[in-house]
From Swiss-Prot:
Gene coding for it: MT-ND4L
Primary enzyme class: translocase
Catalysis: reaction(s): a ubiquinone + NADH + 5 H(+)(in) = a ubiquinol + NAD(+) + 4 H(+)(out)
Organism for this UniProt entry: Vulpes vulpes
Gene Ontology cellular-component terms listed: mitochondrial inner membrane; respiratory chain complex I
Identification of the protein by name: NADH-ubiquinone oxidoreductase chain 4L
Length: 98
């Protein structure tokens, strides 16, 4: 395993650990989730380029589309929670039920 793969895997693990540690605030969770998606995108792109997989060359773009949708939904949820309760604590998400 080359150093590039190890560094990207380490970035993913650090983002995952950040997700576990900073799970009380929604903004911190969204930033850690974006770090995870970025490391997955880079890992997928490097793997496809190194292995010359032409059939899977669209997969990083599909991952970016899903990451953009996730970011838009997460930010809209963050705005809704912060406007309603004045804070971005994740525990307030349970109170948004109808």
């Amino acid at each position: 395993m080359s150093m590039v793969y190890i560094n990207i895997f380490l970035a993913f693990i650090l983002s995952l650990m950040g997700m576990l540690v900073y799970r009380s605030h929604l903004m911190s969770s969204l930033l850690c989730l974006e770090g995870m998606m970025l490391s997955l995108f880079v890992m997928m792109s490097v793997t496809i380029l190194n292995n010359h997989l032409t059939l899977a060359s669209m997969m990083p773009i599909v991952l970016l589309v899903f990451a953009a949708c996730e970011a838009a939904l997460g930010l809209s949820l963050l705005v809704m929670v912060s406007n309603t309760y004045g804070t971005d604590h994740v525990q307030n998400l349970n109170l948004l039920q109808c």
